[in-house]
Amino acid sequence: MRFKNLNPLEQHTARLLLWSALFNGVMISLNQTQDIIARKALHAEVWQLTVMAMIWPVSNFLSIWWGRIFEKSQHKSRYFILVGVLGRLSLFYGLWLTGMNEFMLLMGLVFSFNSLQIPAQNTIWQRNIDSGKRGKIYGYTISLGVFVAVVFTFIAGRALDRNENLFRLILTITAVCGFIAAFLLSLIRIKEKPDEPIHPKLSLKETLTDPIKRTLTLLKKNKPFAAFERSFSIYGMGFIMVQPVLPIFLVDMLKLSYTGNFIAKGIISQIPMLFLSPYLGKWHDKLHPFRFICVFFGLLALFPALIVCSALTLKWHLLSVTLAYVAFAVFGVAMTGVNIAWNMGSIFFAGKEDASMYQGVHVTMTGIRGILAPLLGLLLLKTTGIISVFAVASCFLITASIISWRDYKRLHI
């Protein structure tokens, strides 16, 4: 990446963001493979996989409080240290991990502090990087992180096929790399607003209620942002509801090894992010978010549809596996765009306001659908079968795409 077009602050920020992304790639690998580890190594039951799928989105409920605290703080770097120590080094407990319930608690702790890092990191992007350069630089950080994730995922898959208990060592390595990634973010000098007031200290009651009131006010006054959240909520229902059943499909029905599973979830699905992120990031800078998400929600609808095709051709194993791998390739392309919009979209709607609060609301909304979607997936799995879960998910994604396009036309943007 060339730094000559960046001012000194942008260069300082971009370098540290890239170094952080390098180490965060190992965290990305864990995010993609945790459910396979749960099903194969820890023999997770269906209800545990459902809870596992809920942990990430439900822990995001904390984001509006984290975002508000971060917005008011005069010492922002300390929060990245907090993420590193409690939300990353806690994975060291993996050395003594013996059961699935412990693994769920551990991942709950990790994702709870992740809900602090996301809005905090958005403040860095908003204040330190010019809007015309933001998407492209973000794309490079994603590509670098994904490159590390792909390499680490392949090595981890091969290691686990040789010795399943090595997942404990993998968690330990992830702890160290995750801490370094968070520590590097703490070194970034966040540009302060020239007119930023010194925030008065809030009472405990105000600390608990103020973010909720502000969230409702924000969604009420900023109609385009509320429409953006509506589209993402519909998309999220389709995306999250398949998460508990994916490991069941890959492990129990396709009977893939660790390497086979990790190739699908951690390599094929990630390679498009590796190569496309800088280009789609630049494209995101030029398009309105509604147009952008319309395209990628629609493309993502093909993923569960292809999984249905794979499930219907199980007696032809090679064809079934090939269709599943094609599905994950489509997933990778679509999610490259969705992830860029998920992380950058709220900055667009924030305008000159603090992006951390907007992203806090955005992340917290994930928690609402995170309660409903996995339960809906489990209900469909138990009553009508696994194929219906993917079919309904595809319908949600198509609906999100159509509504996003209608919102774009309705707002005359």
Predicted regions and their residues:
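Intracellular juxtamembrane helix-capping segments at the cytosolic ends
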Residues: 116-129, 336-351
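Hydrophobic core of transmembrane alpha-helices in multi-pass small-molecule transporters
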Residues: 22, 101-117, 318-337
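Juxtamembrane intracellular "pre-TM" segments in multi-pass secondary transporters
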Residues: 1-11, 192-230
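Helix-to-loop junctions at the C-terminal end of transmembrane segments
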Residues: 62-75, 160, 275-289, 381
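C-terminal ends and interior cores of transmembrane alpha-helices
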Residues: 84-99, 298-317
